[in-house]
From Swiss-Prot:
Entry's family note: Belongs to the acyl coenzyme A hydrolase family.
Enzyme Commission (EC) number: 3.1.2.-
Protein name: Uncharacterized acyl-CoA thioester hydrolase HI_0827
Cited NCBIfam families: PRK10694.1
InterPro entries in the cross-refs: Cytosol_ACT, HOTDOG_ACOT, HotDog_dom_sf, Thioestr_dom
GO CC terms: cytoplasm; cytosol
Cystines in this chain: none
Domain HotDog ACOT-type: 13-128
Keywords for this protein: Hydrolase
One Pfam family it belongs to: 4HBT
GO biological process: acyl-CoA metabolic process; fatty acid catabolic process
């Protein structure tokens, strides 16, 4: 199974697969679509996974930029969060998170497309909740993230 999705127009998901789950009836809003707050929660968890790996420890979400809800998610859709590190500062990490779905319970079966994207900013914190410096030495996750950032087109 391919880790990245490609839609019918050839657009491909960006970054690494962070989280994969199933949209359930308990996650719906009053219209019967999946609730935007649930989607945002999944994105925050997925982005935090990547940020924690880079920061080598605890992180907190401090900002969410440009949240775009592109298409609704239906009950039964496979929901996949992809993350891509955009920037690493002294204690902060910016992660772009895209949510893609794969239709498995409704038409058109098998179709994949992007439904939401946003940029999350996380800050590395110590056990007292104070910001801390992201370790630079012996940090393979940071090295991988920085290498991918340098490869991104402007």
């Amino acid at each position: 199974m391919s880790a990245n999705f490609t839609d019918k127009n050839g657009r491909q998901s960006k970054g690494v697969l962070l989280l994969r789950t199933l949209a359930m009836p308990s996650d719906t809003n009053a219209n019967g679509d999946i609730f935007g707050g649930w989607i945002m929660s999944q994105m925050d968890m997925g982005g935090a996974i990547l940020a924690k790996e880079i920061a080598h420890g605890r992180v907190v979400t401090v900002a969410v930029e440009s949240m775009n809800f592109i298409k609704p998610i239906s009950v039964g859709d496979v929901v996949c969060c992809y993350g891509q590190c955009l920037k690493v500062g002294r204690s902060s990490i910016k992660i772009k998170v895209e949510v893609w779905v794969k239709k498995v319970a409704s038409e058109p079966i098998g179709e994949r497309y992007c439904v939401t994207d946003a940029v999350f900013t996380f800050v590395a914190v110590d056990n007292n909740g104070r910001s801390r410096t992201i370790p630079r030495e012996n940090n393979q996750e940071l090295e991988k993230a920085l290498a991918l950032i340098s490869e991104q087109p402007l």
